[in-house]
Regions:
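Transmembrane alpha-helical insertion/packing segments
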Residues: 23-82, 178-181, 244, 249-265
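Hydrophobic core of alpha-helical transmembrane segments in multi-pass integral membrane proteins
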Residues: 50-58, 83-94, 125, 129, ...
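Alpha-helical membrane-inserting segments
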Residues: 55-64, 91-92, 127-140, 229, ...
Length: 337
């Protein structure tokens, strides 16, 4: 993990014009025109994906609220409709010639996963959780001072595990579909324009899609980890890490291990988060030179962000998801006053 990045240029040259160096002026004009077409296509498909997913997920939540008697019934109904929503969403991308499935399977990862790298990646996710909880604590305090009493930092509810269907969606279906869409179809399409831009952009649209501030803070940082793993170690490893985060970390450790190992005021989950944070800080300090080199070698061409965030479809995607994110808090604020 973060060994040396001078190999990146050689790696790109070996793969041909599909992955040219984004800093080469000879390709700049071509890159801009090609990127405009790609980001426009991505924006249109993101809008379709968003509408389809939230429509069927919304139908499932409404049906569960109307008919469910127990927590198992509620999460079972929601889980079924989430499977439908995710499956149909994946089909939207799968049948596109612009985003062929073979690009994902044919992607050549420049690095091989080692036990040490895998352990550091897993620890980094716990470190990310620690940082996200600090951010959420600050946001929670700010909202409280504005007269909006909300709880953003809370333990995972055991009710989530009452339905096996919902657990399967959370631990298997969601990671697979999200990795296909955000890191596979989108990430591998944009990789040639600069890995750093690709990692940050896919992390942003991935986090916004959760439309929940509690999840968005964590999923943005986790999305950076997932995207880095997908690009550097391969799609299959991104799926594995994502599954571990959703199932092993969020369900097995946060719920069951926390109940089995009661450390008093300081829970086992908090201990793991703290250890992960310490490891993450050490990795950043010890590998800072390599991280900086990676950013320098793999940054996108000048103006790539301006082109991206002036696309109408990208703007609409961001605005709608921000609306869904903050609407509940505006409603609380209006009700309070």
């Amino acid at each position: 993990m973060f060994e040396s990045y001078k190999e990146e240029v050689t790696f790109n040259e070996q793969r041909g014009s599909e992955d040219f160096d984004p800093q080469n002026e000879f390709y700049k004009e071509y890159m801009e025109e090609s990127f405009k077409k790609d980001i426009t296509s991505i924006g249109r498909r993101l809008i379709g994906y968003m509408l389809v997913f939230f429509f069927f997920a919304g139908v499932g939540q409404y049906a569960a609220q109307q008919r469910a008697v127990t927590a198992e019934d509620f999460y079972g109904m929601v889980g079924v409709w989430l499977f439908i929503a995710a499956g149909l969403s994946l089909l939207i991308w799968s049948f596109s010639k612009k985003f062929p499935m073979k690009r994902i399977y044919e992607h050549v990862a420049p690095r091989k996963m080692t036990i040490q790298s895998f352990a550091m990646i897993c620890a980094s996710l716990y470190g990310v959780r620690f940082i996200s909880k600090l951010f959420l604590g600050g946001i929670e305090k700010l909202l409280f001072e504005m007269g909006i009493p909300v709880t953003l930092v809370a333990n995972t509810s055991e009710e989530l595990t009452s339905s096996i269907i919902f657990v399967l969606y959370l631990g298997v279906m969601a990671p697979v579909v999200e990795e296909f869409i955000f890191r596979g179809f989108i990430g591998y399409r944009l990789e040639r324009y600069g890995k750093v831009f690709t990692i940050l952009f896919t992390a942003l649209i991935f986090s916004l899609f959760h439309a929940n501030i509690t999840q968005e803070v964590f999923t943005f940082m986790a999305g950076i980890v997932f995207a880095y793993v997908a690009i550097e170690y391969g799609f299959q490893w991104a799926v594995v890490v994502h599954m571990m985060n959703n199932f092993i970390f969020a369900v097995v450790l946060d719920i069951y291990l926390a109940q089995m190992m009661n450390l008093g005021d300081f829970s086992i989950v908090q201990l793991l988060d703290l250890v992960g944070f310490i490891i993450l800080v050490l990795v950043v300090i010890l590998k800072w030179k390599d991280i900086k080199e990676y950013i320098d070698v793999n940054r996108g061409f000048y103006g790539i962000s301006q082109i991206t965030f002036t696309r109408v479809t990208i703007i609409l995607y961001i605005i709608y998801l921000l609306y869904r994110t903050f609407l509940p808090y505006f409603a609380l604020y209006l009700n309070f006053y």
